[in-house]
Amino acid sequence: MRVSYLVVLLCALPVAALGQSAPKSDIPVIHYKAVGAWPKPLIGDKGLPAGPWNYIQVTSVAVKKDGNILVMHRGDDPILEYRPNGDLVGPFGDVKFSHGKVMPMQKDVAASGRKPDMSGYQAVYGAAGCSNCGAHEIRVDPEGNVWVVDAPSHLITKMSASGRTLMTLGTRDKRGKSATQFYLPTDIAFAPNGELIVTDGYGNDRVARFSKDGKFLGAFGTRGNGPGQFQLPHGVVVDAKGQIYVTDRDNQRIEIFDSSGKYLRQWEHVGGLSSLIMTPDQHIWTGATLRDLNGKPIETLPGGGADSRAHGGAMAPNGDVYLGLLSGVVEKYVRQ
């Protein structure tokens, strides 16, 4: 198996992802340490290591119910499965992501009032040389099914734990705002009652709700910067009470809604976050910072840098944290 080594940053990265992040103060002692060189290097000629992994834009990481780690990137073999120790298991799943590029959204940007230098998508989607440009997010639901988001195809796919396609949401290559369409979706989360919560995302600036079997239940949110509005809803998680937490990336905040989509409150000045991780004990990783459900920072990962560097991530049952970076690496942190 051959994995490309070309790494080019996404043309449409938000301004905040280039170094802006919320100031942190009085964050307690760090309980994590970084793991170097994860996953393990491939073995090359003569049994020698072939060098560290260097993917084309790691967009997300997920942890399967069996404990194995799924790494999503935009190169060949877009989903790779590893054991927690870093050994490669092999490619995962039968999903083929979009190879195409999204056409410039000049008219949409002008109509929305978005600034082209934010997430205005004036450039192609994905890195130069990417072969699976649509690979955007990967999540594992409570039953162990694997869900992947293909933004340019406007499609979300549900797979079994073995990688077999079970169901899709959206209509492939057909963008829109109907009950059966997305417009560049970004993430999916799973509510305690079984509902599916989708951030729909780059084009629609809304959050859509579906039943467990994929029936459209409704949507909430409009484009803007007021309460309950979005300028790119990019990541989403749901707590044990069914409250929905959405990263409003271009507005650099997290908005919280009840299970029906009613706006409740927001956390401001958190930077241009792309992804969230809900922990089993009901805390949220916002990039490299762990917060309680009131938004208070509890601790930060060592050397994690700006929270906005992480495009996606996951937490293992033993507390290990994995972050996927568009620079083409996976960062792993273990509890001390």
Q: What are the roles of these predicted feature ranges?
A:
Residues 5-16:
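Bacterial N-terminal signal peptides
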Residues 20-336:
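Eukaryotic scaffold repeat domains enriched in small/polar residues
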